[in-house]
Every structure is written in C-alpha cells, then in structure tokens.
C-alpha cells in the first residue's frame, strides 16, 4: 500500500499544504486522477474545500474531483488513482463516509494500488479506529471503526504542552485513559510538521519534531525522522 499520513495541513510561515507538496510529488509515481473526500469540512462548504485542494495540487498535475459532486461515488473511487481525505472534524468525516457506503470501497481501492493522502482527520481515518482524534464529537458516526489501512493509532497535532494555569488533562493523560480501556492499542503522538509515509511495505516516520509512541504499562518512547515502524 501507498499512504501519506500528515499530522496537519499548515505550518507557521508556510502556505496551506506547502510543506506536504514535495512529499506528495515524490509519491505520485505517475498517478494523476484523484478523488477528494471533503466531509470533515464543517465551517467551510465541501465545494470550497474541494476547490481549495484542487488549486493547491494542480501544479503537481493532479486532477481533483470532489466525491460529493459525482453521480456515482463508488465508480469514482474505483477509477481513482489517488484518494485524498482532508482534515476537519473526524466524527463528521466518518459519519458521512459510512452513510454513503464509502469505507470498504476506499480501503479496497488503496489496497489495490491507489495512493492514500490524508491530513489530520484524514490521517485518523486511515487508522483502525478514530479513537485517537482530538475532535469534539459533534455528530454520531455510528461506531468508531475506520479504514484500518495503517495498523497503529495516530494522534495528530500531538503536543503535551498546556497553557500556564490550565488544569485540564495533557494529551498524554488522555491517551493513557484510552490505553486503560484498550490496552491492546499502540498510539503514535504525531506532532505538527511530521508525517508517516508508507511505500513498498515500509512505514517511515518523517518530519523535524520528536514523535512519541504510547503503549499500555510502558513509558513513552521518543522516535525521530527515519524510524521504521
């Protein structure tokens, strides 16, 4: 499988998806036809989100079609060489994808050669479940099971920092709560600016920041760019 799982879409001082464009270009391998899954967009319309994505990726020669615009979404997924899943609200993304019957077809198409690109919520959707999203559950997705393309759980936008005086849980504390009730899981705390690239059977960590791996009953382990999962 070919996956590009990005923690986030924007870095300080850079345009939207700017840091991801070289990564996308290097993994295209001649692919040009893409479907975009905009369902995580809540405060922007799906048309706006699709147009924004198409404009940014056009210089790479990628032709982007919004899945909500086509008459036959299943046929569009079958024909797609690239499946792009945008960030936003993960619960909304999963709900809309499930209700349209797109989860199994997307997973199957990626397993048969389509490139999967997802940032933030889109990275969460590639995991076995969405249980490590940071998002508010604004809708009920009728279950947390997701695409299960990547075997570990990703927590995007990972940071353990708290504002001065804040008394809420750290991100690690929230992840530890999950591991109490689901000790079989492994969670990757993927900070902004980092990504996981899967190609030719290898999953490799990229980016300038330290990534953390959490397992039940164990201390967190720090990983740096180049680590192979």
Swiss-Prot record:
GO MF terms held by the record: dipeptidase activity; serine-type peptidase activity
EC numbers for this chain: 3.4.13.21
Biological-process GO terms, alphabetical: proteolysis
Keyword presence, Hydrolase: yes
Top enzyme category: hydrolase
SUPFAM superfamilies for this protein: Class I glutamine amidotransferase-like
Catalytic reactions of this protein: Dipeptidase E catalyzes the hydrolysis of dipeptides Asp-|-Xaa. It does not act on peptides with N-terminal Glu, Asn or Gln, nor does it cleave isoaspartyl peptides
UniProt subcellular location: Cytoplasm
One GO term describing the cellular component: cytoplasm
Keywords: Cytoplasm, Dipeptidase, Hydrolase, Protease, Serine protease
Major localization listed first in the record, in broad terms: cytoplasm
InterPro entries: Class_I_gatase-like, Peptidase_S51, Peptidase_S51_dipeptidase-E
Taxonomy, superkingdom: Bacteria
Region forming the signal peptide: none
Similarity comment: Belongs to the peptidase S51 family.
Alphabetical list of PANTHER family matching this protein: ALPHA-ASPARTYL DIPEPTIDASE, PROTEASE S51 ALPHA-ASPARTYL DIPEPTIDASE
Record protein name field: Peptidase E
Protein species of origin: Salmonella heidelberg (strain SL476)
Designated gene of the protein: pepE
